Design a protein with these regions (language model features):
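Binuclear metal-dependent hydrolase catalytic cores
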Residues: 1-167, 175-178, 187-188, 245-279
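Active-site flanking residues adjacent to catalytic metal/cofactor-binding acidic residues
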Residues: 41, 67, 168-170, 199-201, ...
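Cap/insert and terminal regions of metallo-dependent hydrolase folds
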Residues: 176-266
Length: 279
């Protein structure tokens, strides 16, 4: 399974020289199965660049999964160029977001006064499928979901192929259980022994004291969680919109020092723009 990050920034996209390394695009992940299927997770602003890349690579069929429907995870939908072409097939997970199904989320985004093109105007063959929930397969990749702790609800994902596991918890508050969450112990079991975990690392310890119940974790909480879960690689995700490259590098160095103190072998990093890995 090949994994590429097209956006790891939280809440809102950013730009500027101080954000070059980790990037400014919001959440979007591309996963390629060994059988060739393309899986897209979340449609933040990173999906715009991904769309251009898919066209250049002449890939014409994709599966789109969403963790939740907050702005930073869907704001790239209207600018996903493959939607404009007839030869494209997009299979989208059909589920409920605070009582609203996926199709209606798309309809609301793609209508006046927000956007000049409607869902009906798109030329691609777009399907909404309910089977892409709970436990399911896309090609050679087995996928499981779990409700995580986030304001309004969100899903965490586990992707398994050839005994390798990638877990994606982009928006998850480890220090507070929001309504609908399966809880800390269930999350720990879900993540156990993952080869790669991308986890919400929005806040420092001091920042979190002022942001309890906001739906995001502190970095010390994430380190502790990853150690308990015995993951091999930990990628800090949903990077704070004000966090510069220099600040993020300092945080990662501090994380490595803390992990070394506890004799942990976890490879910890912050997920940068265009990060790629094969599991």
């Amino acid at each position: 399974m090949d994994i590429k990050c097209w956006g790891s920034r939280g809440s809102i996209p950013v730009s500027g020289d101080e954000y070059v390394k980790y990037g400014g695009d919001t959440t979007c992940i591309e996963i390629t199965a060994k059988t060739g299927e393309t899986i897209i997770v979340d449609a933040g602003t990173g999906i715009r660049r991904l769309g251009k890349s898919l066209i250049e690579r002449d890939i014409t069929k994709y599966y789109l999964l969403l963790t939740h429907a907050h702005w930073d995870h869907i704001m790239g939908i209207a600018f996903f160029r493959p939607f404009l072409f007839k030869k494209i097939e997009v299979i989208i997970q059909d589920r409920k977001f605070s009582g609203i199904n996926t199709r209606d989320v798309f309809k609301k985004l793609l209508e006046q006064p927000f956007f000049p093109i409607t869902l009906k105007d798109l030329n691609a063959d777009i399907k909404f499928e309910k089977r892409l929930n709970n436990k399911f397969n896309i090609g050679s990749v087995s996928i499981e979901t779990i409700p995580v702790s986030h304001f309004g609800g969100a899903l965490g994902y586990k992707f398994i192929e050839d005994g390798k596991t990638f877990v994606f918890f982009t928006d998850n508050e480890l220090g507070f259980d929001h309504s609908g969450s399966r809880g800390y112990d269930a999350h720990l079991k879900f993540v156990k022994n993952a080869d790669l975990l991308f986890h919400d690392g929005e806040y420092t310890k001091d920042e979190y004291k002022r942001k309890i119940n906001w739906g995001h974790s502190s970095i010390p909480q994430v380190l502790d969680f990853a150690e308990k879960a015995k993951v091999k690689k930990l990628g800090l995700f949903h990077l704070n919109q004000d966090r510069t490259d220099r600040q993020m590098d300092k945080i990662v160095n501090k994380c490595k020092i803390e992990l070394k103190k506890s004799n942990s072998t976890i490879d910890c990093f912050a997920v940068p723009c265009n990060f790629e890995i094969t599991l």
